[in-house]
């Protein structure tokens, strides 16, 4: 399974990458929304972990553009924005899940497993 991490906090991105690699996922890390969109549009990923407050292009817009391009890769948003309106916006933009920072790594891994498990299922 291959996961794209789009996160501008480099320490968090590296920590996520390390933990996911320990769980036998392949990871790529990009630090801004424009690069994240380019990578995600390649269709090479089983999951995108997407920050919201990103340079160049925010996570909401990245999710919108992915869905407009008919990219169905699951998207899990990770953000400090914890208002209900932000959660609604994220999900309505096309995210499949939304977690607020700080988050529990065990819960994040469970959500990653749930979203990647759905790959290939017929809904």
Regions found by a protein language model. Give the residues of each.
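N-terminal/domain-start alpha-helical segments
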Residues: 1-122
């Amino acid at each position: 399974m291959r996961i794209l991490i789009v996160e501008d906090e480099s320490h968090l991105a590296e920590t996520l990458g390390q933990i996911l690699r320990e769980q036998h996922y392949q990871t790529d890390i990009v630090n801004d929304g424009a690069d994240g969109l380019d990578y995600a549009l390649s269709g090479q990923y089983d999951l995108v972990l997407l920050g919201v407050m990103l340079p160049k292009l925010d996570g909401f817009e990245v999710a919108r553009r992915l869905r407009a391009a008919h990219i169905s890769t699951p998207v899990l948003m990770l953000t400090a924005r914890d208002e209900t309106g932000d959660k609604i916006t994220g999900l309505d933009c096309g995210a499949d899940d939304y977690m607020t920072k700080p988050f529990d790594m065990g819960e994040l891994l469970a959500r990653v497993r749930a979203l990647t498990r759905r790959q290939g299922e017929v809904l």
